[in-house]
Regions:
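Serine residues within intrinsically disordered or low-complexity segments
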Residues: 4-8, 20, 33, 37
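Domain-level signature for soluble enzymes in the chorismate/prephenate branch of the shikimate pathway
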Residues: 28, 41-322
């Protein structure tokens, strides 16, 4: 892929084959394209005349930043301090899309993001599984034997227990963000401290990787979602995310799941969360391995007859974790 920048525009030039890969996501986001030629006689050129901005929660150099680079490599990343700000920017139109973590294979779901998907006017267009690699990062010149404290997000610290057991003199210090912890130790010139963060954070803030991939479990993945205001469904969509609330009557969950089973629709995920503002009531989140076809539409119509509330959170291509 060749990327050229002119003034405030981002022009992405891709071969026909690559464009066909990205086309469903680009068009689903509501970004227009035009066809030109001349890069090569056998190559079509598709310049996307838009300053594509993508919001993430957290700092530059974070795992969300890394995931956004895989999903929309030419976009300008807009870091946000809070998850609600990410959704505010998407709804307000100051960014065209956002990349959010939704669940980790070890730590589980990001509850706040499920709640925001349910209540905000956004739509899921793509998912991506990022292999999580935790690295010990310090300022240049600092040796491992000088480290007495390590900063990072609590989840990252918890996923590196073996490192702390093998280095009992090093204290784990919870911090608001993995990449933010690198920025902190570099800015403060802390010679007795390090951070646990993605490798990208070291390059972003001028740190140095002391130890690479210190996570306990190498089968550590985070699932990220690409969201926008547009509800256009791109080609190749074969997965649907749904949120629904059921009436409190006997057998209702069985009936709700039966609408999928009766149509041979497979569920890849089901989870319940407390329904905000309604103590002891719950919302169910379900992923089904079907796109916008007749079977799924009939299943959703059937579900609406049973449930008090149904919301389609997104229809998108299923990704592979491995």
């Amino acid at each position: 892929m060749k990327v050229s920048r002119r003034s405030s525009d981002v022009a992405i030039f891709v071969t026909l084959g690559l464009f066909n890969v990205f086309r469903p996501f680009v068009l689903a986001l509501g970004v227009g394209s035009c066809i030109a030629s001349g890069v090569h006689r056998r190559t079509l050129c598709y310049p996307l005349r838009i300053a594509m901005k993508v919001a993430i929660q957290g700092e530059l150099g974070s795992f969300s930043h890394e995931a956004s680079g895989n999903m929309l490599p030419a976009a300008t990343v807009v870091p946000c301090a809070r998850s609600a700000e990410v959704f505010d920017r998407v709804e307000g139109g100051s960014v065209q899309a956002a990349v959010i973590p939704i669940e980790n294979s070890l730590a589980g779901s990001v509850a706040e993001h499920f709640d925001l998907l349910l209540t905000r006017e956004v739509f899921v267009h793509r998912e991506f599984y990022l292999r999580i690699r935790h690295n010990l990062i310090a300022i240049p010149g600092v040796k491992l034997n000088a480290i007495r404290q390590v900063f990072s997000h609590p989840v990252a610290l918890d996923q590196c227990r073996k490192f702390f057991r093998s280095h009992p003199r090093i204290r784990a210090v919870p911090f608001y963000d993995t990449a933010g912890s690198v920025r902190h130790i570099v800015a403060e010139r802390l010679h007795d401290a390090a951070a646990i963060a993605p490798k990208q954070a070291a390059g972003q803030y001028g740190g140095r990787v002391l130890l690479a991939e210190i996570e306990d479990d190498q089968q550590n993945y985070t699932r990220f979602l690409l969201i926008s205001k547009s509800k256009k469904i791109g080609k190749g969509a074969n997965k649907t995310s749904i949120g629904f609330v059921l009436k409190n009557v006997p057998g209702v969950l069985f009936k709700a799941l039966s609408v999928f089973a009766l149509r041979d629709i497979n569920l890849s995920k089901i989870e319940s969360r407390p329904l905000r503002g309604h103590p002891w009531e719950y919302v169910f989140f379900v992923d089904i391995l079907r796109g916008d076809d007749e079977a799924s539409r009939n299943a959703l119509r059937h579900l609406e007859e049973i449930a008090e509330f149904v919301k389609i959170l997104g229809v998108y291509p299923a990704a592979q974790a491995l």
